[in-house]
């Protein structure tokens, strides 16, 4: 059995490109002078005062992540921006005052012609002054807001720092220490050409699909997750909202561009970004949370090869994956849901009888939106290092504020805390099982097809018995 990438996927990856230029215009925040040619599909919630008046935790986050961000410079930009906004409000108030006065004296008929002309002239001057102030404010506003949106999330107390990983769990199965051939040596099972073009043959092709379906069903049946189907394409505004580095995905070359700014990227449906479109500008009641979701599908994440070794299934761009996404009310609930996802993942991987571990990643490896990340890793005897086969991240309320995903309260609105991540990359799992000498056909998958078929047959027989 041959598992070939679909024609559409190959075409998209062939025509997709990533450009490394710095964008001068943000799709997430568009100033008034650019609003004529571009529209803003989202208006992020930005708490300038609250963020810039409590800099201690933010400074710690910036330092731990190794980011080159000058908070004093951003604060100076804010003061300049705020000063201009105050001048604009004052000019608008003066113009309104002149307009009201002119309307009143004209209605009363008590003003002379000179007084009316003087007020009209004053109104024209204020209008021109206001126009000048707004023109001056646009580049200042854009510079400040873009700098503000580049600020990272504050770190979770459990997040390790200083190039340190915290071990959460290690499976009892012993690690294979002996050097083994690479999985690419199995030419009868894997034909690898490059990262976006490979072929799985026979059992690996079947395992690729069944493992994804099995884990998805396990989360639905055991964890009570709601299964969703997400689009393979995500607009730039959502990538910016989730602070996703643009080099992670391919930019799609669109023939008909609905927007020169808000371009489409090929992400795959089993990605965190793939969920955001369904929750952007959504308002939910507190009683509907927590809201656990899971999606099975493709992931087209570009994996940088930092090992110096040849490309393999560990760096493949295309992979089947299982993505989790949970919205919660509080930070405490988010942490509990993160543990729940990890516990379900541990149940699944333990049945494979292979060594694996779960670690908290160092702060320097997180994206700006993440405050905590747990990596699910398996050991590669061929490359003598751990490979990430899945992960779960905590985003607190950082992303929900930027996509305006709100909780309706009695007197105000709050923002959900989000957790989630791809708990399985099938290509990496297949490669590691092969390298560790396990036969794919002998691996037990929780919630696999055989178990479901047996349960379905039993249910059908019970249904037939009703008519005897």
Tell me the role of every PLM-derived stretch.
Residues 1-3, 467-468:
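A positional/structural detector of protein chain ends, strongest at the extreme C-terminus
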Residues 2-3, 7, 11-13, 18-170:
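N-terminal alpha-helical targeting/anchoring segments
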Residues 68, 83, 170-468:
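TRNA-recognition modules of translation machinery and tRNA-sensing kinases, especially anticodon-binding
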């Amino acid at each position: 059995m041959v598992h070939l990438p679909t024609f559409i996927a190959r075409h998209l990856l062939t025509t997709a490109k990533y450009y490394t230029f710095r964008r001068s215009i943000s799709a997430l925040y568009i100033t008034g002078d650019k609003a004529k040619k571009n529209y803003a599909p989202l208006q992020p919630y930005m708490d300038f005062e609250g963020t810039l008046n409590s800099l201690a935790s933010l400074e710690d986050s910036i330092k731990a992540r190794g980011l080159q961000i000058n908070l004093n410079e951003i604060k100076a930009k804010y003061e300049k921006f705020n000063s201009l906004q105050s001048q604009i409000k004052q000019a608008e108030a003066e113009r309104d005052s002149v307009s009201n006065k002119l309307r009143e004296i004209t209605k009363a008929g008590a003003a002379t012609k000179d007084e009316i002309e003087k007020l009209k002239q004053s109104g024209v001057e204020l209008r021109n002054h206001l126009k000048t102030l707004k023109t001056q404010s646009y580049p200042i506003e854009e510079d400040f807001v873009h700098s503000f949106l580049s600020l990272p999330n504050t770190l979770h107390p459990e997040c390790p720092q200083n190039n340190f990983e915290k071990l959460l769990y290690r499976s009892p199965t012993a690690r294979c220490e002996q050097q083994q051939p690479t999985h690419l040596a199995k030419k009868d099972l894997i034909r690898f050409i490059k990262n976006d073009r490979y072929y799985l043959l026979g059992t690996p092709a079947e395992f690729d699909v069944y493992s994804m379906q099995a884990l998805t069903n396990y989360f639905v049946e055991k964890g009570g997750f709601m299964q969703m189907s997400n689009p393979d394409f995500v607009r730039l505004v959502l990538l910016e909202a989730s602070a996703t580095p643009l080099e992670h995905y391919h930019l799609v070359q669109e023939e008909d561009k609905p927007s020169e700014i808000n371009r489409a990227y090929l992400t795959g449906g089993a990605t965190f970004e793939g969920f955001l479109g369904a929750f952007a500008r959504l308002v939910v009641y507190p009683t509907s949370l927590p809201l656990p979701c899971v999606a099975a599908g493709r992931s087209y994440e570009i994996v940088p090869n930092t090992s110096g070794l040849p490309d393999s299934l560990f760096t493949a761009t295309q992979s089947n994956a299982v993505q989790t996404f949970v919205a919660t009310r509080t930070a405490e609930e988010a942490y509990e849901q993160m543990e729940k996802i990890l516990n379900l993942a541990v149940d699944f991987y333990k049945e494979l009888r292979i060594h694996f571990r779960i670690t908290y990643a160092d702060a320097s490896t997180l994206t700006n939106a993440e405050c905590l990340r747990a990596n699910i890793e398996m050991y590669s005897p061929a490359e003598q290092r751990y490979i990430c086969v899945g992960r779960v991240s905590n985003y607190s309320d950082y992303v929900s504020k930027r996509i305006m995903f709100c909780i309706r309260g009695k007197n105000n609105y709050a923002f959900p805390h989000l957790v989630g991540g791809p708990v399985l990359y099938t290509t990496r799992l297949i490669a590691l099982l092969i390298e560790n000498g396990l036969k794919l056909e002998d691996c037990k998958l929780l919630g696999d097809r055989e178990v479901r078929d047996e349960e379905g047959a039993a249910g059908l027989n019970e249904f037939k018995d009703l008519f005897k």
